[in-house]
């Protein structure tokens, strides 16, 4: 059984007398350990699709099975628990709390899980070590570079041992050098830790890090192809 399996998903909004179909019959299966990039122009449905996959929203109709759980049949009140166990999120804006240290930011999801303090600190340090930032554990976000802040956000996505990481435009606020640093980290998490990575991006060079590329247009999946990742070799060269 696929880790993620959507069948004929629709998301329909009523705007006055107009019916807007943000998703129009999308079926996708993603296996454990895949690295998938999702691309499409603004309004293509890719963000709506990500919100449903991330248990942040539910489809109007269709079925979504997440690691054996029928998300579409699960009460919204219970989806937060499913989301916290199964999914880690990384966003373009980092979403770090400014007045707390890198370590405390990484600990945050475990507070919601009622993890004991000593265990929280240990797991948060392990996550920071995994992203190469253990030596920056006591630094505030404004004492870190953009790339380092995003690595803290990635560490935060790891601490609950979720099998899936959803990354929504994770390099959107980063220069080329920092983008390569972050994308190399995603590649390592995928290859060495077996994390399933689902990446939304509008940048073709960033999408080349993935082993599979899905494209959306007008609420529909228009292509779904395997690819050989070329990573940093596909990134534009910075001017000297």
Regions found by a protein language model. Name each.
Residues 220-240:
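Conserved beta-strand-loop-alpha-helix hinge in the C-terminal portion
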Residues 2-216:
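ABC family nucleotide-binding domain
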């Amino acid at each position: 059984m696929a880790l993620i399996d959507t069948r004929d998903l629709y998301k329909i909004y009523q705007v006055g007398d107009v019916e807007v179909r943000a998703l129009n019959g999308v079926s996708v299966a993603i296996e454990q350990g895949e690295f998938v990039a999702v691309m499409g122009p603004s309004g293509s449905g890719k963000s709506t699709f990500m919100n449903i996959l991330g248990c942040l929203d539910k489809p109007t109709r269709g079925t979504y099975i997440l690691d054996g759980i029928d998300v579409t049949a699960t009460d919204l009140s219970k989806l937060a628990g499913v989301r916290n166990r199964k999914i880690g999120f990384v966003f373009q804006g980092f979403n770090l709390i400014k007045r707390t240290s890198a370590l405390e930011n990484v600990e945050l999801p475990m507070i919601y899980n009622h993890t004991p303090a000593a265990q929280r600190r240990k797991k948060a340090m392990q996550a920071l070590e995994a992203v190469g930032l253990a030596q920056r554990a006591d630094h505030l976000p404004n004492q870190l570079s953009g790339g380092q802040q995003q690595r803290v956000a990635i560490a935060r996505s790891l601490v609950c041992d979720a099998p899936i990481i959803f990354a929504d435009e994770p390099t959107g606020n980063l220069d080329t050098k920092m983008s390569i640093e972050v994308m190399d980290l995603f590649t390592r998490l995928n290859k060495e830790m077996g994390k399933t990575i689902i990446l939304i991006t509008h940048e073709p060079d960033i999408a080349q890090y993935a082993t599979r590329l899905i494209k959306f247009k007008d609420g529909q999946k228009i292509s779904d192809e395997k690819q050989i990742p070329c990573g940093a070799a596909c990134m534009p060269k910075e001017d000297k």
